[in-house]
Amino acid sequence: MARIFSNEPLKRRFIGKALVSFMLCAAVFPIPDLFSLPQVNGSLTYVEKIPILKLWGTPKEQGFAYGMLTGPKIIAVFSKFLESNNLGINKNQYESTIIPGLSRMKIEPAYEEELRAMFAGIRASTKENIHISFLKRELKYTDLLAINCLNDMIRMGCSSVSAWGKMTSDGLPRIGRNNDWHQIPAMIENQLVVARIPPPESGKLAFVSVSWAGIIGCITGMNEKGIVLTSHDASGLSPSVRTGFYPYMLTFRDVIESTSPGTAVKNVEDVLKRRVSGIGKNLMITIPTGSDGPAAVVFELDGDLTKESGFTKRFPRESDSYLICTNHFRIRKEPSGTCERYALLLESMKSIDPNTAVNKVTTKRIWELLKQVVIPGWRTHHSVVFEPDKKIMHVALEEIGKDAPFCQAVTLDVSDLLKLKK
């Protein structure tokens, strides 16, 4: 039987296919001039080895602080990403395919403003133009846009498992998440935990996410209400439209900034109905206890708007107090094979007798499961275990040659990270 994102590296043929799809998106953005802001609305600190970037204020203020505080990290991620032999992208392909594709991407004005400010912050931090040797030219604003669209072009393999109620030792939810991708040392070495605090008048929720320097979207995170978001690539249905695709990391940021317990499913639906994805994605949302509705849900989404507005919801069975997500659709599109990681996580959940107190899910057990579902040949860039009721994230970042779940985890208090110190 065929494998779906099995424990083998993806072939480079996916890159070419994704690049073709990437060209089918909408809006032109000029390169901004350098400008200054009166203050830096951010801080960069460390909890043990984990860098914590805290940003607050408007998109412009947050973007400038991001660039000012992490400029060298962003430059390293971008330049070494292009130079990686694992991706098969050459200079001509980048300049002739990816950059023209960016001119057709649809980016919300607030995100464009934030990226422009980030570019200005990087320039201010280095006090000079930034030469990218691989491209034989200076860094441009459009390159920052490319970083934030990179996962729309080159796919990731990830795993998540969520358990709650009778499946956990204390009845409270636990979520484990591995983020697996190509081995690119500069990206592994320049991961960040980012805490974002929007202005109260914005109506947006504060959140904490984990990703690479330069990314303003969200692939792994928890918001101030305890909503947990994890994303996973999947093989979706072919798009029914040819333009107007949104970078999915920015779409998922919209989700985490606007989703609350009690209305979570509707909140996510409202965002996805306004955002068209050009690729297949699984978006898993887990909700703290005490709310009406499901404890977790997976949204299987792609660009086929003729089928259920572009996404299909997958809920846990009524008898189950767990939900698993890897890299394939299970409802929207018939699975074409097996996924070893999904099967392993499913077997582990089924082995638990919810009527006994033995062998139930704990934070420690989630970590052991994450160790078992790393993808050989790739690297697990980050692993996170979430406790949404307590608003706690246990975060482990990969060290070169050592997958994230095998590295020392740091416990972070999300509520504390999202406070502005007086």
What are the residue ranges of the model-derived segments?
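Internal mixed beta-strand/loop scaffold within catalytic domains of large alpha/beta enzymes
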Residues: 144-251
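N-terminal secretory signal peptides that target proteins for export/translocation
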Residues: 1-13
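Bacterial N-terminal signal peptides
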Residues: 18-30
